């Protein structure tokens, strides 16, 4: 599989670039805050990944370009996760990857949910991302358990009639541990939401 090519960047758009390689021009999809610059004189190393899919009995290829090998590796890992496609993966690359990695290692589900473009399902998928060393497998298991706790808590509160946004705001203020007690967590979150609602009421009174 091709890891990178050397070519001239002949066009730079918001989420696409054109690279000329061996007298052939290729379209590449990119993340929004990429650092590619147009240069018709010098060849540049472009880290790339090709996705092939069948659409209407035809093989369609999509090419993606990255500034660094690290970005390419993250993209390849992300698209292997359930619920994360190429578009979502590119959006995630717009964030601080070291920050995301740290949140994953800390099993910090609520912090992941606070990242731009990350919802509950994506945060859960990220916690299962295999960026851990073999000696840290136990952390990975705990991360999944914590994600299960947040999911159960979210669904329980939603069934009680609370709005999605107020639930998400409250979840960012609590910590779920692997040995969580769902009834205690529900009571804690309801208390937080009630306190917040009272604050809003007092300010508007």
UniProtKB/Swiss-Prot annotation:
Q: Does the keyword Transport apply?
A: no
Quick one: where's region Domain I? 1-67
Q: Which GO terms describe its molecular function?
A: ATP binding; four-way junction DNA binding; four-way junction helicase activity
Q: Which intervals of the chain are annotated as region Domain III?
A: 150-205
State its location(s).
Cytoplasm
**Location of the region described as Domain II in the Swiss-Prot/TrEMBL record:** 68-146
CDD domains, alphabetized: UBA_RuvA_C (cd14332)
The record's section on SUPFAM superfamilies has:
RuvA domain 2-like
Q: Which UniProt keywords apply?
A: Cytoplasm, DNA damage, DNA recombination, DNA repair, DNA-binding
**Which cellular component appears as one GO term in the record?**
cytoplasm
Function in brief = The RuvA-RuvB-RuvC complex processes Holliday junction (HJ) DNA during genetic recombination and DNA repair, while the RuvA-RuvB complex plays an important role in the rescue of blocked DNA replication forks via replication fork reversal (RFR). RuvA specifically binds to HJ cruciform DNA, conferring on it an open structure. The RuvB hexamer acts as an ATP-dependent pump, pulling dsDNA into and through the RuvAB complex. HJ branch migration allows RuvC to scan DNA until it finds its consensus sequence, where it cleaves and resolves the cruciform DNA.
Domain remarks in the Swiss-Prot or TrEMBL record: Has three domains with a flexible linker between the domains II and III and assumes an 'L' shape. Domain III is highly mobile and contacts RuvB.
Q: What protein name is recorded for this chain?
A: Holliday junction branch migration complex subunit RuvA
Which source organism does the UniProt entry give? Answer: Mycoplasma genitalium (strain ATCC 33530 / DSM 19775 / NCTC 10195 / G37)
Gene name in the database record: ruvA
